[in-house]
Every structure is written in structure tokens, then in C-alpha cells.
């Protein structure tokens, strides 16, 4: 597969997962309304070819299903993402190999890292057209406004690239930007993010911070930029590790930064420390409008793009959204890393409906009383991204944590609310979460939905009903003989069981 956005669009079209829309659409509200309906139904990616006010087409919902995200990462099944997670786990906490086989596996990972180093493109497609000076007008890019209460037009899937003015180490993040004028935008990032750290360092040295925004990149690179990695590692290296070969980079025209050579658009500008403008409100992943915050102002002096570029975008909100699908894929990648940190956890799942981080379901191979509570506490402290997880449900390894019917059964049949529910008060809390009494401070809940063993219970636990293994195998062998071979039992319609989805 080609390592650019166009190659991915072509792949989706070949596999029947892209629809081209030739009717004129408005980037103000209409594009998002159409796309949201497709997202709710798990529909195909969309390419709007006739966008009001812009000569450029808009691509959206390309990563609207887990299947398509797997394709973006050159995979066919979500389980393959765990193999990638195993590589990252080795790199994060390498251990001396105890066996020859372990040494060979680690050697393979190191070889993959060597292959993943970025390359250079001295005649990049992203600079086929250069616009600067008085000709620069960001309104030419078909930026969308997703919700009626949004403050303005936004960029959502741009790679925001900055560099540490001391070490030269780049940071690549996916941050929201709001259009302020034809040459300026505000960037919304948390104080702990790499771009914010770089801006503070530039301020300490009395320098402007150079910024590049790469739009319309290979979705695989977006996934790499969204992966929490150690501060001193490069997202370009991670993207190469994800894709199996290095990312081709190009030097910007007016700033000392590098961007993916096959980007559809590149914006080049600077931030003067202390120069801020109000940013927001905008609809966010919590399903509400966020607040208004003073955010750094980026002044752009140059725009480059490919010939006939395609603008890639998305928007936040209540799941399902593309960000939720990305989170499900990252969930699989984190799994081996989490197992390395907390060995008793056999699997974990962050349900999309819980915003992909507010609630976690973890399974354990239970061996002693109190283990479920220990596993929940260990989960909260294992990785920084679990800091704001409000609910942790612990189940036995026999429970399919990705089947809500099994999880609800485990809670209903194995939990005594007095004994098995524990609350941690006054813990760090997501500032975007309105549920807490105090901003930034709230509680957490753990639920032990495992089978209880003495001394957790004083009575004998019931025996779980199971089919006879021999008969189950016999029925599977004779299924077609019964005349039922045309019935697919692997795809379940929840609406047949009382749900309204």
C-alpha cells in the first residue's frame, strides 16, 4: 500500500469502503451532519468533491471503523495490533534475554527500529505549490465547523510539529486549531503536551517557536502521533515502526522543521510566547461544549500543498466517532505493555461508549482473595493515560470482556455491592468532565465481578452452566447437515435482544 493519504483512499475505494459525493456541500455544519450519520451506522469513508467556498475536496470518516484503521496500519485483524504492542513493550522496558529465542526476538525488534528511521525527500510532493505573502489565505482550505455552538472553523487531524530549542528533538502531536484570521490560528494543547513544553522553553530563551502543520497525511502517521510515547523518542520513528519502513520527510520552506513529504497541505508559522487569543467553545469528546480558553496564536507565513490536494478532517463528540475507533486500536496496542506492567492482567478493554477511557474492563487469572482489588489499583497506576479512568470492572479470564452480555452477567451474578464495590475519593479528575463536584478532583470506583473464593465468601460458589464439550463438537460438525449452514452465528443483531441500536 502507498504510504500517503491518496494511497489509502484508493485502497478504501477498491474494497468498497468509500463513497464519493458530487453534490455541493457546505463545510459549515453540513459535512459533519452527513458524516455523523455515517459514523453512527458504521458506514464507509466519504470524499466530498464539491465543497462550497473551496476548490479542494474533503475526506472524512476514513478511519470510522476498526477494520479500516487496521488496513491503515497494513493489518487485517485487530489482534495483529497486539504484536505491534509487544515490540513497543520491549522497547519501553527492555530486559536481558534469558533464552536464545528471546535474544532473537529482541534482535528482530532492533532490526525493525533500524528500518524505521525516517528518510529524506529533496523534491517533496507537498511543495508542488507554494503560497506566501499577500496571497496566503487559510480560508481557501475547506475547514469545517461541526456543531452550531462552535466558535469557528477548526483543524482536527493536523500534525502539529515543533522542536525543542535546546535538544533539537521534534514533537508531533494532534491538536485542535481554530481559525482566527486569514493568516492566524489558535492551537489548543494541554500544558503537559510536547508542543506546550517546547513553547515554554522558547519563552525562557526569548525566542519564537517555529510550528509546522501537516494536513492530509498517511493515517498510519496519525496513529503514531496519537500514541503516548517517552518524551525523548521520535514519533517519526514510531510511525516507521508501525509501517515497517521509514517515513519520508521534507524540510519546510520557511521554518527549520521537517514534515511528511507526501502531506497534502503544510502550514508554516511561528508562535510568539505570550501572544494569546480566546479559543472555543467547541464540541468535545465528552459530548458537551467545552469552555473558552486563552490559547497560543500561530502566525502563518507560508502554505504549500500538492497539486489537486485532498483535505482530511474529522470531529469530536459522543461516540462513535473516528477518535473512538482510533482509541480501540490503541487499546490493543497498549495490551502487551499493560501485561508487562501488571502481569496478572490477562486482557483489558476500554468501551467506546465510555469515551474510550472513562471505564475499563480488565480480566485476571484469579489465584487468591483480594486479587481483583489489587489488579484495579495496579491498573490505575500502570500508565499515565489511565489516570482519568473513573470505573474499573474486574472479571474472570473466562469472561469475554468485549461482549457486554457477558460483562453485565458477571456484574449481576458475582457482585455484592457492599463487599465488592470500593470508592477512592479526591483523586485526579479530567477537567473536561462536568460530573465532579470540583474541577480536576473527583472519585474512582472499582467493581470486583470475579468469582469469590474464601475468605471472600463463607458459602460454596455455584457451578457455571456449560454445554457438554463432546456434544458441542458433534453439533458443530453436523451443523450443515441440520440444514442450518446458511445461518451465520458469528454476527449478532443486538436489536433482536431488546436493544435499540
From Swiss-Prot:
Pfam family, one: UbiD_C
Family matches, as InterPro entries: UbiD, UbiD-like_C, UbiD-like_N, UbiD_Rift_dom
SUPFAM superfamilies in UniProt: FMN-binding split barrel (SSF50475), UbiD C-terminal domain-like (SSF143968)
Annotated Gene Ontology cellular component terms: cytoplasm; cytosol
Gene3D superfamilies assigned to the protein according to its UniProt record, in alphabetical order: Single helix bin (1.20.5.570), UbiD C-terminal domain-like (3.40.1670.10)
An example molecular function term from Gene Ontology annotations: 3-octaprenyl-4-hydroxybenzoate carboxy-lyase activity
A biological-process GO annotation: ubiquinone biosynthetic process
Sequence similarity: Belongs to the UbiD family.
NCBIfam families: UbiD family decarboxylase (TIGR00148)
This protein's name: Uncharacterized protein sll0936
Amino acid at each position: 500500500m502507498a504510504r500517503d493519504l491518496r494511497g489509502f483512499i484508493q485502497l478504501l475505494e477498491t474494497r468498497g469502503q468509500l463513497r464519493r459525493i458530487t453534490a455541493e456541500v457546505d463545510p459549515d455544519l453540513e459535512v459533519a451532519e452527513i458524516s455523523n450519520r455515517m459514523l453512527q451506522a458504521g458506514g464507509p469513508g466519504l470524499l466530498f468533491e464539491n465543497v462550497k467556498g473551496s476548490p479542494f475536496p474533503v475526506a472524512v470518516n476514513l478511519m470510522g471503523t476498526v477494520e479500516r484503521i487496521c488496513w491503515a496500519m497494513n493489518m487485517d485483524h485487530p489482534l495483529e495490533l497486539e504484536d505491534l504492542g509487544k515490540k513497543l513493550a520491549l522497547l519501553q522496558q527492555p530486559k536481558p534475554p534469558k533464552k536464545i529465542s528471546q535474544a532473537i526476538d529482541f534482535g528482530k525488534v532492533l532490526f525493525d527500529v533500524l528500518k524505521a528511521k525516517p528518510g529524506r525527500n529533496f523534491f517533496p510532493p507537498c511543495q508542488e505549490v507554494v503560497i506566501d505573502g499577500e496571497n496566503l489565505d487559510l480560508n481557501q482550505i475547506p475547514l469545517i465547523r461541526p456543531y452550531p455552538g462552535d466558535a469557528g472553523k477548526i483543524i482536527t487531524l493536523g500534525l502539529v510539529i515543533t522542536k525543542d530549542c535546546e535538544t533539537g528533538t521534534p514533537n508531533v502531536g494532534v491538536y485542535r486549531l481554530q481559525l482566527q484570521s486569514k493568516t492566524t490560528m489558535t492551537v489548543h494543547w494541554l500544558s503537559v503536551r510536547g508542543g506546550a513544553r517546547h513553547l515554554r522553553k522558547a519563552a525562557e530563551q526569548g525566542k519564537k517557536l517555529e510550528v509546522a502543520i501537516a494536513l492530509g497525511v498517511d493515517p498510519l502517521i496519525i496513529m503514531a502521533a496519537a500514541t503516548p510515547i517517552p518524551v525523548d523518542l521520535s514519533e517519526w520513528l514510531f510511525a516507521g515502526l508501525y509501517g515497517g519502513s521509514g517515513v519520508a520527510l521534507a524540510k519546510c520552506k520557511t521554518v527549520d522543521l521537517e514534515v511528511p513529504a507526501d502531506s497534502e497541505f503544510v502550514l508554516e508559522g511561528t508562535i510568539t510566547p505570550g501572544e494569546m487569543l480566546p479559543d472555543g467553545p467547541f464540541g468535545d469528546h465528552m459530548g458537551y461544549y467545552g469552555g473558552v480558553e486563552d490559547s497560543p496564536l500561530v502566525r502563518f507565513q507560508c502554505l504549500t500543498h500538492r497539486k489537486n490536494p485532498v483535505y482530511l478532517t474529522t470531529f469530536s463528540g459522543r461516540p462513535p466517532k473516528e477518535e473512538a475507533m482510533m482509541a480501540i486500536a490503541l487499546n490493543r496496542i497498549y495490551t502487551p505493555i499493560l501485561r508487562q506492567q501488571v502481569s496478572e492482567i490477562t486482557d483489558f478493554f476500554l468501551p467506546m461508549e465510555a469515551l474510550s477511557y472513562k471505564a475499563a474492563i480488565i480480566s485476571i487469572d484469579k489465584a487468591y482473595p483480594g486479587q481483583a482489588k489489587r489488579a484495579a489499583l495496579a491498573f490505575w497506576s500502570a500508565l499515565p493515560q489511565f489516570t482519568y479512568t473513573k470505573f474499573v470492572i474486574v472479571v474472570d479470564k473466562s469472561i469475554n470482556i468485549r461482549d457486554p452480555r457477558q460483562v453485565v452477567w458477571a456484574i449481576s451474578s458475582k457482585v455484592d455491592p457492599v463487599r465488592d464495590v470500593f470508592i477512592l475519593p479526591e483523586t485526579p479528575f479530567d477537567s473536561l468532565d462536568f460530573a465532579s463536584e470540583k474541577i480536576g478532583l473527583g472519585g474512582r470506583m472499582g467493581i470486583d465481578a470475579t468469582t469469590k473464593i474464601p475468605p471472600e465468601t463463607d458459602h460454596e460458589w455455584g457451578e457455571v452452566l456449560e454445554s457438554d464439550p463432546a456434544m458441542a463438537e458433534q453439533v458443530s460438525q453436523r451443523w450443515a447437515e441440520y440444514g442450518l449452514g446458511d445461518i451465520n452465528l458469528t454476527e449478532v443483531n443486538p436489536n433482536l435482544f431488546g436493544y435499540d441500536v
